[in-house]
């Protein structure tokens, strides 16, 4: 479960589990962080980079990804291998620093674990930028992670652990249902 992945699935993990008559566990939701895709200024995208619309941008992005798939990974791995020990040490420190910076006051353990994953993405992206792999300005990976984290937290609806939030929701439901009895 040490994987990070993206999915273009239209159904959430919770939806898939429900269709099989199951429920998701809190740990599953922390390992498979679901970020809503319509968090940008243009639906799924924040910028269209001079293109006329989201569809044109999406088609161009897909074509470029198909053509360039994997090329930056090789460059990144080669750059990392040049001084793996120093890069690993720096990444660990950056992940810790970024996670502390991103973690809201009162966040539960599950949110903290998810934020560690966001911090990993930010730190790896910033390192890739410093190594000349991305072509992005410094700080862009962290900015993008902040956008995704904000969307994830808003979608989640609370900072606590899932079990605690479920208990509170049950109590609220009971009080609401029996408030006039």
Feature locations, PLM:
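Extended alpha-helical interface modules used as scaffolds for assembling large macromolecular complexes
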Residues: 1-4, 9, 13-181
